[in-house]
Amino acid sequence: MNIFEELKARGLVFQTTDEEALVKALTEGQVSYYTGYDPTADSLHLGHLVAILTSRRLQLAGHKPYALVGGATGLIGDPSFKDAERILQTKETVLDWSQKIKEQLSCFLDFDNGENKAELVNNYDWFSQISFIDFLRDVGKHFTVNYMMSKDSVKKRIETGISYTEFAYQVMQGYDFYELNAKHNVTLQIGGSDQWGNMTAGTELLRKKADKTGHVMTVPLITDATGKKFGKSEGNAIWLDAKKTSPYEMYQFWLNVMDDDAVRFLKIFTFLSLDEIAAIEEQFNAARHERLAQKTLAREVVTLVHGEAAYQQALNITEQLFAGAIKNLSAAELKQGLSNVPNYQVQAEDSLNIVDMLVTAGISPSKRQAREDLQNGAIYLNGERLQNLDYSLSTADRIDNQLTVIRRGKKKYAVLTY
């Protein structure tokens, strides 16, 4: 199976400009290709991982990747399938985000070894050197307004309004392809399927300005079995930066994917062979309640993104919280595992009597209910049942002298911090 066949088998090929010519190029020699990442935030997220890992698969097959950070295009904003104009960031912010994205990409692509080692480029380097007049004369003249208006990404914004700034975005992205081809002989661009219009602007410019043929391959935008956009949990993006989304949160995200998605995601997001995935699928289908596919997915992706130690920690937090063994975890681990739990900052004037604290921290709605909860054995202090109505919290109840965990029943938690 050649690399293109494997990408197809994994569900990673959505659309290509000329499949036959692309397969020929990929099987007959080394292809230089690029994927672009606009710095629209200070971290990449799971949605970016599809293109990143596709790029890595091609590199492992002997092809040479260029990772383009859009220091210039990030200042403009891509209108593709956005309902409204993006808020423009300052140059300083975009340059800072560009640097952080570069660092993240180096975790996935090999920038150090072999003749096909990855290269990092930033389109700010060339756009900052070209004048507006030169850009209009040398690049803009190759694009008709009719051609630009025909793009779906533009059509969807015509009625609500699109600025000239965003309208010109596709020309800038097209010039990226031309520039990389001229300097590095890049002949293939990879991106999400929503980028098709912008990406083919590059092949059009190559054809008109240099009489060369470029290839485009898009990867699908991933949705779950219900059609919901992939990569978000409770409306929040799952970031690749551990400071924004902890390894534990990422582990839980993968652990909770639906059965109908789990095997498909193993093909897309892991480097397990297709034969290994087929074997996992067989075991998974025989005993879905054991969630083998989800557990494998969580292990593989968290290890890939954050490393083995972070995966082991996420697994340990999961197991200890499930067992209610709060004292087996450090304060740092509890902050990861209980990041979505209500947090109460204990004040100097607060009563430390357990009945009072249950009400103050929002665990019980009233003192009467708090007493009943204690008497009924529903209250747990750092994982241990507490029934003493006269108990007062002390420094001995603080894990790592930082926090105390109170639970009512099985699921209602509060974290007290000091």
Swiss-Prot record:
Motif ('HIGH' region): 39-48
Record's GO cellular component terms: cytosol
Domain of life: Bacteria
Pfam families, per the entry: SYY_C-terminal, tRNA-synt_1b
CDD domains hit by this protein: S4, TyrRS_core
Function: Catalyzes the attachment of tyrosine to tRNA(Tyr) in a two-step reaction: tyrosine is first activated by ATP to form Tyr-AMP and then transferred to the acceptor end of tRNA(Tyr).
Quaternary data: Homodimer.
Protein name as catalogued: Tyrosine--tRNA ligase
Organism: Streptococcus equi subsp. zooepidemicus (strain H70)
